[in-house]
Amino acid sequence: IAKKMGRSDAECELLYQAGILHDIGKIVTPDSILLKPGKLNDLEYKLIQEHVKVGYDLLSKIPMYKEMAEIIAYHHEHYNGRGYPYGAKGEEIPFLSRIMIVADAFDAMTTNRIYKGKKDVAEAIEEIEALSGKQFDPEVVETAVEILSKIEIPDSVNQLPMTEVEKERFAYFYRDQVTNAYNADYLTFILKQKSIEKKPCFFHIVSLHNLGLYNKNHGWKEGNKLLRRFVELRQ
């Protein structure tokens, strides 16, 4: 986008590097917020907004990253002044930041998130055009649409857990505290993902009958032991 808009090779490279580091401030965002599979409440939203300032503070202290920090500091601003953290508007937002804002939004829209399915390219472009002059610089949007319409997004682009470490991070939301088995929320999440991917799947349903009676006769601690043992046998 920057190249198409006549920016120098040095500026394009600077913006590219800033794009890689633009969310580095999220290293201080708690997983309970960052990975939450649902809408954030007001406090959580306020806390996640802090990642912009944290990212700027981290990078601006390193001479070779200072220019990148200036770009990153504005990547959640809106063209109409309703963004954060500064409420900057129009040309108060650095030009390279205005490009990053559009590119970042397109990336977010076309990536499968733990809490939200992705849009296809046409849907994302339609939303970007609808927000031209509000969230986005109209001049940037005009060029971005031309570039982004030619992009093909593979189905594999997502933010879903792949490694064992990532799966353990997500366990906060999706594992039962007693048995460590995946819970009903995880089943809902899987079904939602499969519907987005339009891929067939099948499930085995196993019922454990009369657990209430077992708890009544032996106590809930023994009932929990039975549940854990049952889960171990099924894994």
Model-derived features with residue positions:
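Signal-transducing coiled-coil/dimerization helices and immediately adjacent hinge/linker segments
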Residues: 150-178, 189-193
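Alpha/beta-hydrolase
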Residues: 21, 205-208
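A short, mixed-charge helix-start or loop-turn motif at secondary-structure junctions
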Residues: 37-41, 172-173, 216
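Protein kinase-like catalytic core scaffold
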Residues: 101, 202-204
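A conserved signal-transducing helical linker
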Residues: 2-5, 15, 168-176, 181, ...
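PAS/PAC or PAS-like capping segment
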Residues: 106, 208-209
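Conserved long alpha-helical elements within nucleotide-processing catalytic cores of c-di-GMP signaling
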Residues: 174-175, 180-202, 209-234
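Histidine- and acidic-residue-rich, metal-dependent catalytic cores
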Residues: 1-165
